[in-house]
């Protein structure tokens, strides 16, 4: 079934009264060229499983299905379910719709066998960062997904790919750099969305590392949270609540340094020093 045989998105939104809700962080994409570009960025999707979070009225969903994917769409806004069901009727057996909150979803249980899914989504802005953190810290590793192609506010995208000694470097950059290889694929202007956000957006492509540096995710999460929670303070101060003096001595890291100067490898060393 061709994507062209579906009614225009604007018509669907009017018919189902689907004005985006600010409380849900919704910004809908109408540009079919753009949604197709996002789908292509995820790679060859023919007969491949894809997880989409926050599909809304299904603009990106249509593009993923048109590329031949088997899509599992997770949507918490009940208003959108009927519009998604109409798309599913055009692609029998290719669109599974799960009504619920992605933050409460057990993603590892969605695909118990077969190829690993790719995650492709225009994430709701109010939960996008937390979802990414959950996916970066998931156990076991390698993770349940083979790649992620995700839309974020530009500022969040820059934090994901940031390197030490840069303005955007922080906890997100350390965790992403430890377990994945991430790049900003392209930017998306505000006028591509309804309603237009006040900032530029970016699509980030993320591929898991098969063998990241050995480290407990929980420990690294704790270290980075403490270090960047007081990022302007020296490490001997910011890590004080978690026994920082002993950790710094054990790793040979200068306690007068600040969090943004440490490499991913140094953060991993601190996390491993937490082990008894």
Curated annotation (Swiss-Prot):
Gene3D superfamilies linked to this entry: Ribosomal RNA adenine dimethylase-like, domain 2, Vaccinia Virus protein VP39
CDD domains: AdoMet_MTases
GO CC, any one term: cytosol
Enzyme class: transferase
Domain of life (superkingdom): Bacteria
EC number: 2.1.1.182
S-adenosyl-L-methionine among keywords: yes
Nucleotidyltransferase listed as a keyword: no
Binding-site residues for S-adenosyl-L-methionine, renumbered to this chain: 27, 29, 54, 75, 101, 122
Xref: PROSITE patterns: RRNA_A_DIMETH, SAM_RNA_A_N6_MT
Reactions catalysed, as given in the entry: adenosine(1518)/adenosine(1519) in 16S rRNA + 4 S-adenosyl-L-methionine = N(6)-dimethyladenosine(1518)/N(6)-dimethyladenosine(1519) in 16S rRNA + 4 S-adenosyl-L-homocysteine + 4 H(+)
InterPro entries, alphabetized: KsgA/Erm, rRNA_Ade_diMease-like_C, rRNA_Ade_Mease_Trfase_CS, rRNA_Ade_methylase_Trfase_N, rRNA_adenine_dimethylase, SAM-dependent_MTases_sf
Compartments, as annotated in UniProt: Cytoplasm
UniProt-listed Pfam families: RrnaAD (PF00398)
GO molecular function: 16S rRNA (adenine(1518)-N(6)/adenine(1519)-N(6))-dimethyltransferase activity; RNA binding
SMART domains (UniProt xref): rADc
Alphabetical keyword list: Cytoplasm, Methyltransferase, RNA-binding, rRNA processing, S-adenosyl-L-methionine, Transferase
Function: Specifically dimethylates two adjacent adenosines (A1518 and A1519) in the loop of a conserved hairpin near the 3'-end of 16S rRNA in the 30S particle. May play a critical role in biogenesis of 30S subunits.
Protein family (similarity comment): Belongs to the class I-like SAM-binding methyltransferase superfamily. rRNA adenine N(6)-methyltransferase family. RsmA subfamily.
Name of the protein in its database record: Ribosomal RNA small subunit methyltransferase A
Organism: Brucella canis (strain ATCC 23365 / NCTC 10854 / RM-666)
Gene: rsmA
